[in-house]
Regions:
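Nucleotide-sugar donor-binding and catalytic loop/hinge architecture
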Residues: 34-48, 70, 173
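Conserved active-site histidine-acidic residue motif and adjacent donor-binding/catalytic loop
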Residues: 80-83, 94-107, 118-120
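Catalytic binding pocket for nucleotide-activated donors in carbohydrate/polymer assembly enzymes
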Residues: 120-157
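A short, active-site helix/loop in glycosyltransferases that binds the activated sugar's phosphate group
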Residues: 1-23
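Carbohydrate-associated surface elements
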Residues: 8, 27-30
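Acidic donor-binding loop of glycosyltransferase active sites
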Residues: 108-120, 130-131
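A charged, aromatic-enriched C-terminal amphipathic alpha-helix characteristic of glycosyltransferases
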Residues: 146-175
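Conserved catalytic-core segment of nucleotide-activated headgroup transferases in glycan assembly
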Residues: 46-88
Length: 175
């Protein structure tokens, strides 16, 4: 059985490789719900983007800089610089931070997250009761779409204990 970390990957595997849907399942990456939990919202409107600063995220970051400026919000960007374009894009409402494992420090200080596809920052934000912007991008970073996503009612499906139980169930089904 093929374990996929999000529905889009499941669909991609089934359609690109002609895999029978009964041979695939979605088990989301697990998240430590003791680290990512409901925190009070900050007073200042702030969007958090966490990700590698590279060609794939350039147009997304440019869009976030423009959108947050228009909406009078701060934009915090956390990530490893693998391209030098960010230095030319920073504006007074944008702050850059080096990568860190302690991302919850930044999530606590934002009221929304943003990222490409359904990634860690969006899910960690949801677990912390923050809605998130999800950018759909192609393999070159072109923006195909952008959606604002409220915290899902079934956010507990991302808890580590549920991921473990789903993995065990998949093994039991195979055996």
């Amino acid at each position: 059985k093929y374990i996929c970390i999000r529905p889009e990957i499941k669909n991609f595997i089934e359609t690109s490789f002609d895999i029978d849907p009964t041979k695939t399942t979605v088990i989301y990456n697990s998240f430590d719900e003791t680290r990512f939990k409901h925190y009070p919202l900050p007073k200042k409107k702030r969007v958090l983007f966490v990700g590698t600063i590279d060609y794939l995220r350039k147009l997304t970051i440019e869009d976030l800089i423009k959108t947050t400026k228009e909406e009078n919000k701060e934009l915090w960007i956390v990530g490893k610089k693998r391209a030098d374009y960010l230095d030319n894009l920073l504006e007074p409402h944008v702050k850059y931070f080096e990568p860190t494992w302690n991302v919850e420090k930044y999530i606590k200080e934002c009221d929304e997250t943003a990222g490409i596809l359904l990634g860690r920052t969006t899910i960690e934000g949801w677990l912390s009761n923050r809605p998130g912007w999800i950018y759909d991008v192609d393999e070159t970073g072109n923006i195909l779409g952008k959606t604002f996503n409220k915290v899902p009612d079934d956010v507990e499906k991302f808890h580590s204990k549920n991921a473990i139980n789903n993995i065990l169930k998949s093994y039991e089904d195979i055996l």
